[in-house]
UniProtKB/Swiss-Prot annotation:
SMART domains referenced in this protein's UniProt entry, alphabetically: HOX (SM00389)
DNA-binding region(s) in UniProt: 241-300
Phenotype upon gene inactivation: Perinatal lethality and dorsal lobe of the pancreas fails to develop. Reduction in the size of the islets of Langerhans, probably as a result of fewer beta-cells. Additional ectopic V2 interneurons (V2-INs) at all axial levels of the spinal cord; phenotype exacerbated in an LMO4 mutant background. Genes typically expressed in V2-INs expressed ectopically in motor neurons (MNs); phenotype exacerbated in an LMO4 mutant background. Abnormal guidance of motor axons in an LMO4 mutant background.
Localization terms from the record: Nucleus
GO terms, biological process: cell morphogenesis involved in neuron differentiation; central nervous system neuron differentiation; diaphragm development; dorsal/ventral neural tube patterning; endocrine pancreas development; motor neuron axon guidance; negative regulation of transcription by RNA polymerase II; nerve development
One Pfam family here: Homeodomain
Main subcellular localisation: nucleus
Biased composition (Basic and acidic residues): 302-314, 343-354
Protein name, as recorded: Motor neuron and pancreas homeobox protein 1
UniProt keyword list: Acetylation, Developmental protein, DNA-binding, Homeobox, Nucleus, Phosphoprotein, Transcription, Transcription regulation
Taxonomic placement: Eukaryota, Metazoa, Chordata, Craniata, Vertebrata
Organism expressing this protein natively: Mus musculus
GO MF, one annotated term: DNA-binding transcription factor activity, RNA polymerase II-specific
């Protein structure tokens, strides 16, 4: 019976290793093989007593059970999820256990390099991390390093910044020992691109200055607006704002002069026709005719005064004395004195016969200056009368005294 039991145990021992190897998944086998290759220098330097490396100690649940007993190997045929998770060396411990994991990795072999790893070891660590990611991402795990001590620097080198919060000194030491091609940290990116503004405070200040300059220029502080000369200068000089002069063309002036020779006053239909033909407004035509009539009346009055002076000079040379001739002419012009009723009636008759536009023209002359030597712009008069000459004045040469 004992021989048969021993035979069965030997048979089980002979058959179990292939079964245990077959039940092992492909990613797990790849991770364990890479972990043993990375921890090779530690084994070579430690001799016979250093056969168990840091990676094998980090995978202690699987390795200890594999060497414990044949009964435990039978149980390993159907590995449970906790054991499978523990068998993966790519698991990253919690932040509180980082020191313990690093210590275990350091105690794996006395000759195992950690902080001063060569580029070959860094490449092997990166390959182990990639293999662990292939097996661990399917289970929703975060990819980490292949060994306990070197997993943290490899992860920091691949991702540029630590996933878990640990000390800045450990991060700097981990980044300093890795290959430059694998480091994507923020300080190295800053050094690789010195042309870009690295200081956000300086960038904000320059942007603020540019924004302030644009706002000030649009508000008229840096680029002042042109002043309005049409109203400000005249209001300071004359006390009121006046419109700028209308510049008539030579063709418009010729046509207006022609219409003025035909008729001194324009009716509304005629004024509308002239304004439409000359591409002017009715107000411009009206004001031009009004100012032109005032100019014509002044010139006519000046001619009459010149004729009176010439007649006075002729009469003064052939008569008695200059003073007597003047008194005589005044008496002849004025006639004998009349009673109060007749004088008042004559005064009313003179007011009725006077030109109604004369007073209006005198008022409008100050408000609307001439545009050039020929004429000016203007406001219209609605009256259309054919009288070209003003009513006779009392002192004029053509006035005769009323019969008594």
């Amino acid at each position: 019976m004992e021989k048969s039991k021993n035979f069965r145990i030997d048979a089980l021992l002979a058959v179990d290793p292939p079964r245990a190897a077959s039940t092992q998944s492909a990613p797990l086998a790849l991770v364990t093989s890479l972990a043993t290759t990375v921890s090779g220098p530690g084994r070579g330097g430690s001799g016979g007593g250093g056969t168990s490396s840091g990676a094998s100690r980090s995978c202690s649940p699987a390795s200890s059970e594999a060497t414990a007993a044949p009964g435990d190997r039978l149980r390993a045929e159907s590995p449970s999820p906790p054991r499978l998770l523990a068998a993966h060396c790519a698991l990253l411990p919690k932040p509180g256990f980082l020191g313990a994991g690093g210590g275990g990795g350091a105690a794996g072999g006395p000759g195992t390099p950690h902080h001063h790893a060569h580029p070959g070891a860094a490449a092997a660590a990166a390959a182990a991390a990639a293999a662990a990611a292939a097996g661990g991402l399917a289970l929703g795990l975060h990819p980490g390093g292949a060994q306990g001590g070197a997993g943290l620097p490899a992860q920091a080198a691949l991702y540029g910044h630590p996933v878990y919060s640990y000390s800045a000194a450990a991060a700097a030491a981990a980044l300093a020992g890795q290959h430059p091609a694998l480091s994507y940290s923020y300080p190295q990116v800053q050094g690789a691109h010195p042309a870009h503004p690295a200081d956000p405070i300086k960038l904000g200040a320059s942007t603020f200055q540019l924004d302030q300059w644009l706002r000030a220029s649009t508000a008229g502080m840096i680029l002042p607006k042109m002043p309005d000369f049409s109203c400000e200068a005249q209001s300071n000089l004359l006390g009121k704002c006046r419109r700028p002069r209308t510049a008539f063309t030579s063709q418009q002036l010729l046509e207006l002069e022609h219409q003025f020779k035909l008729n001194k006053y324009l009716s509304r239909p005629k004024r509308f026709e002239v304004a439409t033909s000359l591409m002017l407004t009715e107000t411009q035509v009206k004001i031009w005719f009004q100012n032109r009539r005032m100019k014509w009346k002044r010139s006519k009055k000046a001619k009459e005064q010149a004729a009176q002076e010439a007649e006075k000079q002729k009469g003064g040379g052939g008569g008695t004395g200059k003073g007597g001739s003047e008194e005589k002419t005044e008496e002849e012009l004025m006639g004998p004195p009349v009673s109060g009723d007749k004088a008042s009636g004559r005064r009313l008759r003179d007011l009725r016969d006077s030109d109604p536009d004369e007073d209006e023209d005198d008022e409008e002359e100050d408000n609307f200056p001439y545009s050039n030597g020929a004429g000016a712009h203007a406001a219209s008069s609605d009256c259309s009368s054919e009288d070209d000459s003003p009513p006779p004045r009392l002192g004029g040469p053509g006035h005769q005294p009323l019969p008594q």
